[in-house]
Amino acid sequence: EEGFKLIMIRPDKVKMAKEMIVKAQSKLLIGTVISFPEGINSLDEKLAEALKAIEDGADELDYVCNYQAFKRGEIELVKEEVLKGTKLAFEHHKVAKWIIEVAALTDAQIIQISALIKNVVIPNFKEDFYFNVFVKSSTGFYQTENNLPNGATVPAVIMMLENASPLPVKAAGGVRTYEEAEEMIRLGAPRPFNRRGDRRNLLRQAGRRELVPAWG
């Protein structure tokens, strides 16, 4: 487990992973992605995919928000999917994360969509559930131009924190060194995510100190 809280896997692998974790008597959690990586599936498709993942043993659901619809001004569509996707997680005692794909958004849009998610969650769910609804920065798969970052950046995370609070923020993509992970945690994003190719390097840099980034 290497000190990691959670593994992130595709929905079709959740059942197999759950069986392996149970067999190993591990406490490792399973997270999976919904409507990955573009977030353009219909609401019904997203909910069906999420429910199947829950039934297969997923603990955390990382929905890709329909940020393209948001950019087109289809605000009610985005509000509805955030409400119903979060409600499904709430009813099954699961964590919901909403990936907003910061590399595809302007600063103003990052601010607006972070606030939108907060403003859907706060009036519709109990306060003790707020900390189970994350605003997450990135899929790590968005194609940028001119080699611009496609994951979490310090400015983007700050904007998310300032506008999503009290919902927690997850920094994903671009967190490749111990120092970067430490900076994200210091800012207030407690669970920086790094993909498989970087996690051993992070552990080596951390020297297995107390501060170890969560994978997921």
Predicted regions and their residues:
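Active-site cofactor/substrate anionic-group-binding motifs, chiefly glycine-
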Residues: 4-60
